């Protein structure tokens, strides 16, 4: 019989916490079983394989991550939403490096995979933030990839203690967010119709007096 108190959800939560502690690449069913005080075969009554455990952790991570960003940007727009969302991502990766790594590595296994809905939560929050900059819809994917690349790189480097120069890391993060904000504002301006062009066309359409 499965150990009382263990469920697929509780095993997943325990695996996620352990991944944060020791690193996702060090997580195994055997190590998790030892942490939970059970024999490894007992875990397979709740989670069928190492791969399923990793996938469950990924779904949990992306759900938490999406909710963290959504809550951070609620009621904000423009640079305020950008800064809040970016800080939420930075904090999540720092606090949960193992489960974030699981989420970043996972891929959907089919159209009904809950990972798709979990990932959509993240994308929806970032998309809402970007629309505050009035970027053309066709350009949003490029902006999204830029955000992911920069913020993922910074957050994972920081979580791995990768910044060794004495310059304050918070100052660097603020500088990066300001830089992204200016870039997004410039992209929006670049794609807006020229007010001079509009006024000229209006003037041309006026009847001669």
Describe each model-derived feature in a short phrase:
Residues 1-6, 188-209:
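N-terminal intrinsically disordered/low-complexity leader segments
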Residues 30-34, 43:
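Append "Primarily bacterial transcriptional regulators
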Residues 8-16, 20, 25-26, 37, ...:
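An amphipathic alpha-helix adjacent to DNA-recognition modules
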Residues 149-166, 180-192:
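Amphipathic C-terminal alpha-helical segment
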Residues 39-41:
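Key DNA-contact positions within bacterial/archaeal DNA-binding proteins
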Residues 109-137, 141-146, 167-182:
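Amphipathic alpha-helical packing segments from all-alpha helical-bundle domains
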Residues 94-113, 156-164:
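Amphipathic alpha-helical segments used for helix-helix packing
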Residues 56, 70-101, 110, 123, ...:
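Hydrophobic alpha-helical connector segments
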């Amino acid at each position: 019989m499965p150990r009382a108190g263990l469920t697929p959800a509780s095993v997943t939560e325990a695996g996620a916490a352990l991944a944060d502690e020791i690193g996702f690449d060090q997580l195994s069913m055997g190590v998790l079983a030892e942490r939970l005080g059970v024999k490894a075969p007992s875990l397979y009554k709740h989670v069928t394989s190492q791969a399923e455990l990793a996938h469950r952790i990924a779904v949990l991570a992306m759900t938490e991550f999406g909710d963290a960003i959504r809550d951070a940007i609620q009621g904000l727009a423009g640079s305020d939403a950008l800064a809040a969302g970016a800080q939420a991502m930075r904090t999540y990766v720092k606090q949960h490096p193992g489960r974030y790594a699981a989420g970043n590595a996972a891929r959907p296994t089919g159209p009904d995979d809950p990972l798709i809905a979990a990932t959509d939560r993240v994308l929806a929050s970032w998309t809402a933030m970007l629309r505050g900059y009035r970027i053309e819809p066709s350009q949003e994917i490029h902006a999204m990839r830029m955000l992911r690349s920069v913020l993922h790189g910074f957050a994972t480097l920081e979580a791995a203690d990768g910044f060794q120069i004495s310059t304050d890391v918070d100052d660097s993060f603020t500088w990066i967010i300001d830089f992204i904000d200016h870039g997004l504002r410039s992209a929006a301006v670049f794609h807006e119709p020229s007010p001079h062009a509009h006024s000229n066309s209006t003037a041309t359409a006026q009847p001669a007096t």
